[in-house]
């Protein structure tokens, strides 16, 4: 009986297997080969292997792949490294080990000299972070299968697709145009980004293999793109950020209604190369009106003199300045609700001045006569917002307590009995008004019970203590209710703080309004003082350099290429037997920065005492009188003296008598 067709089919790799293989291989063979950024991994729990070292991996690829073009020996040497060896030996079956070696070879062969493309990066989609991209190294013809740009395809279920989308790892998902099934492709082909007018397309070579074929001619330095799907970036790709949509100002690049689109191009920013000199005062005035996105500054000057001293001086001056209005010092409710950002800085608390005996006595008498309240004296003006508590001096508090004990009645019955009904009504009205206008500071600064108990017993004996009545008097009851309400409000606030905060998770963050070219020459990437936008002297691309005290001559892509192949980008190998260009394999012997003259020219500085170039010297010689070097001048003088006995002025030379023969 003939075997069934399903039995002859090879078992496909699962999503977990392909993700594990691809993560460690991109980490070892891309990130650790002079790559200036990192490739996004498929698993959030992946951590780079400690056994993968950049010098070791780069040396193997340069010796075995770039120079010898031997993939078998490169594969064997790579599997002897600590990181890859540990992962390879951890695989259980021979089938898994064979699949891992095949996937390893897909990444190794991209470093062959005949590979027409290379892995680069772009910040078009997120501005602040770089993602992998594919750039052509030579011209590619139409309908040409792009060599070594291949991968493996894995069909995923809807549940797996939802899990990948929730983790924001759906950057390699494609939808088949025939079967309409969703699949995830891994390998070097996953570095190709999406474009609505792509210059290449994905093709299936086997039941799991894919390759990329050019649909139109591709020039050197152009990004190789494919089409992911019609509705991959929302409905009708309404959130697409590709180059075609940027040029046509559509989808995510579409400007808002009522706004004029501003094309932030590189040519526009560099067209204003020459301008008249202006004073620094004019620059400071007109600097606020300049938009960084319209006229970007490649090397902004950020002063490093913003020290702690200036900040502290500004804070102390703002605190101590007495000329500020009272309304400007009032804090809003939002400011009071949130804690300060710098809790280490303590606010300076003022001390209440010591009130004299006569003034305190007068204020206490008036307060006791008008209101009849026992609680406290209102001695400070009313303020709308609470201020920090101020601790009074002990002497002042004792004096106030003495005066209160002498003048203010203790028993509410005695006060009620001694007063007439008119006085009672006036006391009630004045008490209510005083309670309404009482500030929080006055309530908080009540004398403590310990201070009252510490008074001499002789003074305490003079006061007759009367037990409180069963029915409380109106002013006392009003004050107690007011305090209880405040305490209840504080208790409610404390309870509210203890409640857990509810966080509403958003599936997608709010879309940011993008403008064409906002990812180039943008100040968002210049987060440090010595960061600058630099233009590569080889490929004319712009890149951000950190610690740009000395300007680099090449971009990270050109530097990586020269370190691996020993030639200037995009050359990878000798053109023929007559090619005499030197191949420098030790990248440490190459000076990667600009010379002093070019450095001054880039920074728009004058070259004081700088040596002129050969072309400038040749032009000066042709325009002016002939110049001679030291050796040339000596030779010229010697020849003239030998030919004639005249001086340069025309007079005859006199020979010294010591040199004459006797």
Curated annotation (Swiss-Prot):
SUPFAM superfamilies: SET domain. Gene3D superfamilies: Histone-lysine N-methyltransferase (1.10.10.1700), SET domain (2.170.270.10). One of its GO terms (molecular function) is histone H4K20 trimethyltransferase activity. It catalyses: L-lysyl(20)-[histone H4] + 3 S-adenosyl-L-methionine = N(6),N(6),N(6)-trimethyl-L-lysyl(20)-[histone H4] + 3 S-adenosyl-L-homocysteine + 3 H(+). Residues 260-437, 484-516, 601-662 are annotated as: Disordered. It is found in: Nucleus; Chromosome. Its main location: nucleus. It is an enzyme of class 2 (transferase). GO terms for cellular component: chromosome; nucleus. Residues 115-229 form the SET domain. Histone methyltransferase that trimethylates 'Lys-20' of histone H4 to form H4K20me3. Belongs to the class V-like SAM-binding methyltransferase superfamily. Histone-lysine methyltransferase family. Suvar4-20 subfamily. This is Histone-lysine N-methyltransferase SET9. The lineage of its organism: Eukaryota, Fungi, Dikarya, Ascomycota, Pezizomycotina. The gene is SET9.
């Amino acid at each position: 009986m003939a075997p069934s067709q399903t039995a002859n089919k090879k078992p496909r790799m699962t999503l977990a297997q392909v993700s594990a293989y691809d993560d460690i291989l991109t980490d070892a063979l891309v990130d650790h080969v002079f790559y200036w950024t990192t490739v996004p991994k498929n698993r959030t729990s992946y951590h780079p292997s400690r056994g993968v070292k950049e010098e070791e991996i780069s040396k193997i690829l340069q010796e075995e792949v770039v120079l010898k073009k031997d993939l078998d020996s490169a594969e064997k040497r790579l599997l002897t490294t600590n990181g890859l060896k540990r992962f390879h030996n951890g695989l259980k079956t021979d089938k898994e080990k064979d699949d891992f070696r095949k996937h390893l070879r897909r990444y190794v062969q991209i470093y062959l000299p005949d590979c027409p493309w290379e892995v680069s990066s772009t910040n078009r989609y997120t501005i602040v972070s770089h993602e992998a991209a594919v750039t052509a190294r030579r011209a590619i013809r139409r309908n040409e299968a792009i060599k070594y740009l291949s991968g493996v395809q894995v069909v995923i279920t809807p549940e797996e697709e939802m899990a990948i989308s929730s983790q924001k790892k759906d950057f390699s998902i494609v939808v088949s145009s025939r079967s309409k099934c969703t699949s995830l492709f891994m390998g070097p082909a996953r570095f190709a980004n999406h474009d609505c007018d792509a210059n290449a397309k994905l093709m299936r070579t086997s039941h799991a293999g894919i390759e990329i074929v050019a649909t139109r001619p591709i020039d050197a330095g152009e990004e190789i793109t494919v089409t992911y799907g019609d509705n991959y970036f929302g409905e009708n790709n309404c959130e697409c950020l590709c180059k075609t949509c940027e040029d046509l100002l559509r989808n995510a690049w579409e400007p808002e209604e009522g706004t004029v689109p501003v094309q932030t191009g590189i040519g526009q920013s560099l067209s204003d190369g020459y301008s008249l000199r202006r004073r620094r005062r004019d620059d400071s005035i007109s600097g606020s009106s300049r938009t960084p996105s319209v006229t970007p500054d490649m090397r902004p000057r950020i002063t490093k003199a913003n020290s702690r001293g200036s900040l502290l001086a500004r804070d102390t001056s703002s605190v101590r300045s007495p000329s500020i209005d009272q309304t400007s010092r009032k804090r809003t409710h939002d400011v009071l609700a949130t804690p300060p950002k710098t809790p280490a800085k303590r606010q300076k608390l003022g001390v209440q001045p010591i009130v004299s005996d006569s003034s305190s006595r007068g204020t206490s008498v008036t307060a006791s006569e008008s209101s009849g309240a026992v609680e406290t004296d209102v001695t400070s003006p009313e303020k709308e917002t609470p201020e920090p508590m101020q601790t009074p001096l002990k002497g002042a508090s004792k004096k106030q307590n003495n005066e209160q004990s002498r003048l203010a009645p203790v028993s509410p019955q005695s006060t009620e009995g001694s007063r007439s009904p008119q006085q009672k009504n006036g006391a009630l009205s004045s008490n209510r008004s005083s309670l309404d206008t009482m500030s929080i500071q006055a309530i908080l600064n009540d004398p403590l019970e310990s201070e009252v108990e510490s008074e001499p017993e002789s003074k305490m004996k003079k006061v007759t203590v009367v037990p409180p009545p069963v029915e409380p008097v109106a002013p006392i009851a009003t004050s107690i209710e007011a305090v209880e309400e405040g305490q209840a409000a504080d208790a409610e606030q404390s309870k509210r703080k203890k409640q857990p905060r509810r966080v509403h998770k958003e599936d997608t963050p709010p879309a940011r309004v993008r403008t064409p070219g906002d990812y180039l020459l943008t100040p968002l990437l210049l987060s440090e003082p010595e960061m600058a936008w630099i233009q590569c002297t080889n490929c004319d691309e712009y890149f951000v350099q950190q610690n740009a005290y000395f300007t680099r001559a090449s971009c990270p892509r050109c530097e990586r290429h020269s370190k691996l192949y020993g030639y200037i980008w995009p050359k990878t190998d000798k053109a023929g037997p007559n090619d005499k260009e030197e191949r420098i394999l030790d990248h440490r012997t190459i000076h990667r920065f600009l010379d002093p003259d070019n450095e001054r020219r880039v920074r728009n500085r004058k070259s004081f005492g700088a040596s002129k170039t050969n072309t400038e010297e040749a032009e000066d010689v042709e325009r002016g009188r002939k110049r001679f070097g030291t050796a040339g001048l000596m030779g010229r003088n010697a020849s003239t003296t030998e030919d004639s006995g005249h001086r340069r002025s025309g007079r005859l030379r006199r020979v010294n008598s010591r040199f004459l023969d006797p």
